[in-house]
């Protein structure tokens, strides 16, 4: 690779008086000839003037020197030239120079895009030594104004006209040096040594780079200027004293061969020191043939590692892919092994559960003592509560016939324990009337006093308590409270209404400020802990399934909404019964929960009480999904009594408010939209319309009075509750015929044929597997 040294100033010495200055390309250049490169024939000066042209070319291994002798006596011109630039001439190779520059630029861009980062770093490292040489040469002697003056003064003896021209060259050189010194203040500037013309784009790029690096290089530039001002004498002495870097001041005894040896010696090469960041761009641009290449390569090279990663060799890629595949296979094997182990554990657990169930059933069948039977029955009950999948094994072991026969024993405690385990397994007794009778109560807070007025009228017409009128009672939120008080605790309506009002006054009394703080903290205006404490004191900690011990208790359910299973809320049924194995309900639920937990979960209205966590499920008010549980109750009854017809469904609402004001606006606000969404979720009339159209006539009865005021759920003032009670009574009076029809249906007794069928079914279940006559 050839190394080109470019000088900012060239000095010509012309012996001809016509011209002192020469032109190279578009710039006026001056050259001076050293004594070692020319000689004069002292014998006959006018006859012949011998000059020698010294051309030097350096590369990495050697330096080539050549002499060209000229005898221009015909032209009367005698000159000697020293040229330390090996840049391409302007003559015949002009086109090839431009093409090589374009080719170098394209090669640099292609290498920046497709090459690796290491190749770019190697490419940039090659520019630094030449830039160092350029700085060293330009600073030492040839660019200094005083050296030019000394060279011109030493040549005054040959021509007087040359002296005048040399003064002109001196002024040109002075201004050139001044421009160079002023250009040093900018990081990116144009020097006269650059032979490549950039045009307008060069100025735009230079201004952009100088403005970007100006703040960073300000301190170092100030320090450098100060050092130059403090040592002017030292620079002057260095420029005037002979040195190895100044060609014009070399001694005469030094031959060109010695110069060649020194330049070819690797130990005499100038040491390449790291160049500062503010000078690196100028050094790249100072190279006439590779300036653009260095500039493009220097700026794009830093972006290539970010845009393109280093290509990996095929063995490395294969090794990485093999490791990745091995890791994936290892994970798959571990996952498969874990799945197999889990499956084995489930199988072992299921086998152990089945074995435990068989052992308990066989132990119960071998027991003859009534007291020991109670213990065995309770053990089996707790086992099936913990592992419901064991019910199928117990049925296969003929547990139902034995329990039915055991229920005939005259022991109330044993009979209660047997009724509980039969309800848990899913065995049910026949219904009370001619068909299934269902009572459902909507949610609505303290507006439940409206439903109490309807129930009071039914009790008055039938002369029977509520728990004897219906086979299945289901409620949501406040309706669940009424269902438990009437169906499980068998409270009279007067006592139930009094307790209902007391619960409202105890729970729905809260300071506004305290409630607002609680709302922001737990999203509940009222104290949920107080509500839980009241429920525990009033209801107790008995399990739902334990209520089946009482033969007079109907099937009771409370509805809540699970909000953390899947993307949509799901209804959850707290039951006091279990489904027979093989019967699948559409709704989640269980009978192993406590009664107060069921009411707490069903009444967790958002904004009023905090949501209730029960196990891994998060429960909220059932009214969010099914505020009218009539359809759910009908489905559950079909699962319990699949072969029994439906006699009637009585659905009780807590009052509805319908405004006659019509909004004529063409759009609705966000508040109105949210209110409509909430109203549609808690709407009860759509279910009523659906069931009324699907069920047979005189089967579905809905009682939901229209109230004149939109009373909130947490209303606890007595005057407002009395107003609701009065509106409920007026509604009953207007629908007196409808109430009488319901009372008549509920008062009907079973026919004789139905009673015989029930007796036969009981005997067949009790003596399953025995001959027919033994069942009688």
Swiss-Prot record:
Motif mapping: GXGXXG: 443-448
Protein's membrane topology: Single-pass membrane protein
InterPro entries documented for this protein: Acyl_Trfase/lysoPLipase, PNPLA8-like, PNPLA_dom
Biased composition (Basic and acidic residues): 221-239, 247-263
UniProt domain PNPLA: residue ranges: 439-634
Keywords: Endoplasmic reticulum, Glycoprotein, Hydrolase, Lipid degradation, Lipid metabolism, Membrane, Mitochondrion, Peroxisome, Transmembrane, Transmembrane helix
Transmembrane segments: 469-489
Motif annotated as GXSXG, chain positions: 475-479
Recorded metabolic or biological pathway in which this protein acts: Phospholipid metabolism
Regulation: Calcium-independent phospholipase.
GO BP of this protein: arachidonate metabolic process; arachidonate secretion; cardiolipin metabolic process; fatty acid metabolic process; intracellular signal transduction; linoleic acid metabolic process; lipid homeostasis; phosphatidylcholine catabolic process
The protein's name: Calcium-independent phospholipase A2-gamma
Organism from which the protein derives: Mus musculus (Mouse)
């Amino acid at each position: 690779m050839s190394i080109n040294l470019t000088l900012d100033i060239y000095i010509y010495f012309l012996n001809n008086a016509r011209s002192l200055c020469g032109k190279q390309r578009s710039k006026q250049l001056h050259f001076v000839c050293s004594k070692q490169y020319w000689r004069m024939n002292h014998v006959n000066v006018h006859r012949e003037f011998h000059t020698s042209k010294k051309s030097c070319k350096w590369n990495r291994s050697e330096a080539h020197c050549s002499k060209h002798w000229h005898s221009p006596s015909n032209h009367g011109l005698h000159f000697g030239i020293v040229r330390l630039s090996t840049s391409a001439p302007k003559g015949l190779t002009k086109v090839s120079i431009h093409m090589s520059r374009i080719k170098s630029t394209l090669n640099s861009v292609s290498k920046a895009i497709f090459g690796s980062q290491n190749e770019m770093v190697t490419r940039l490292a090659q520019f630094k030594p030449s830039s160092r040489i350029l700085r060293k040469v330009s600073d030492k002697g040839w660019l200094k104004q005083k050296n030019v003056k000394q060279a011109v003064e030493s040549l005054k003896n040959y021509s007087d006209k040359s002296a005048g021209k040399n003064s002109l060259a001196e002024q040109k050189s002075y201004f050139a040096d001044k421009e160079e010194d002023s250009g040093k203040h900018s990081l990116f500037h144009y020097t006269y040594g650059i032979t490549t013309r950039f045009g307008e784009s060069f100025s735009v790029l230079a201004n952009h780079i100088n403005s970007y690096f100006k703040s960073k290089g300000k301190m170092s530039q100030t320090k450098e200027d100060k050092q130059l001002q403090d040592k002017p004498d030292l620079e002057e002495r260095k420029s005037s004293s002979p040195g190895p870097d100044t060609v014009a001041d070399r001694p005469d005894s030094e031959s060109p061969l010695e110069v060649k040896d020194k330049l070819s010696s690797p130990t005499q090469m100038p040491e390449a020191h790291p160049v500062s960041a503010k000078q690196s761009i100028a050094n790249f641009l100072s190279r006439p043939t590779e300036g653009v290449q260095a500039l493009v390569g220097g700026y794009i090279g830093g972006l290539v590692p970010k845009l393109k990663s280093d290509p990996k060799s095929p063995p490395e890629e294969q090794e990485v892919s093999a490791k990745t595949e091995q890791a994936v296979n290892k994970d798959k094997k571990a996952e498969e092994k874990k799945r197999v182990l889990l499956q084995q554990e489930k199988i072992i657990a299921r086998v152990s559960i089945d074995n435990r169930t068989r052992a308990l059933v066989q132990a119960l069948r071998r027991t003859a003592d009534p007291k020991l039977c109670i213990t065995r029955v309770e053990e089996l009950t707790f086992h099936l509560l913990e592992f419901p999948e064991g019910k199928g094994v117990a049925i296969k072991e003929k547990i139902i016939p034995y329990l039915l026969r055991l229920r005939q024993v005259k022991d109330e405690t044993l009979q209660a324990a047997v009724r509980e385990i039969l309800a848990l397994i899913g065995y049910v007794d026949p219904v009370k009337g001619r068909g299934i009778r269902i009572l459902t109560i909507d949610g609505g807070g303290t507006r439940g006093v409206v439903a109490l007025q309807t129930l009071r009228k039914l009790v008055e017409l039938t002369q029977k308590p509520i728990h004897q009128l219906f086979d299945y009672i289901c409620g949501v939120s406040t309706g669940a409270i009424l269902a438990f008080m009437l169906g499980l605790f068998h409270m009279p309506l007067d006592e139930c209404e009094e307790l209902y009002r007391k619960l409202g006054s105890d729970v729905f009394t809260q300071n506004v400020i305290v409630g607002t703080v609680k709302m922001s903290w737990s999203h509940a205006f009222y104290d949920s802990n107080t509500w839980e404490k009241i429920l525990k004191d009033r209801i107790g900690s008995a399990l739902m399934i334990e209520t089946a011990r009482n033969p007079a208790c109907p099937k009771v359910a409370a509805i809540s909404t699970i909000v953390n299973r899947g993307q949509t809320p799901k209804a959850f049924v707290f039951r006091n019964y279990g489904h027979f194995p093989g019967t699948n309900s559409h709704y989640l639920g269980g009978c192993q929960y406590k009664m107060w937990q069921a009411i707490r979960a069903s009444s967790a209205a958002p904004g009023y009480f905090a949501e209730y966590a029960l196990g891994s499920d998060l429960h909220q008010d059932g009214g969010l999904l099914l505020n009218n549980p009539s359809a759910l109750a009908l489905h559950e009854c079909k699962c319990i009594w699949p072969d029994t017809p439906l006699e009637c469904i009585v659905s009780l609402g807590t009052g509805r408010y319908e405004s006659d004001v019509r909004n004529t606006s063409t759009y609705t606000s966000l508040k109105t939209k949210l209110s409509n969404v909430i109203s549609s979720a808690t709407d009860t009339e759509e279910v009523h319309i659906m069931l009324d159209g699907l069920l047979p006539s005189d089967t579905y009865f809905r009682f939901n009075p229209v109230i004149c005021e939109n009373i909130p759920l947490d209303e606890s003032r007595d005057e407002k509750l009395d107003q609701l009670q009065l509106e409920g009574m007026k509604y009953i009076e207007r629908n007196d015929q409808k109430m009488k029809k319901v009372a008549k249906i509920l008062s009907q007794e079973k026919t004789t044929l139905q009673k015989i069928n029930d007796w036969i079914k009981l005997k067949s279940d009790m003596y399953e597997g025995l001959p027919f006559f033994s069942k009688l």
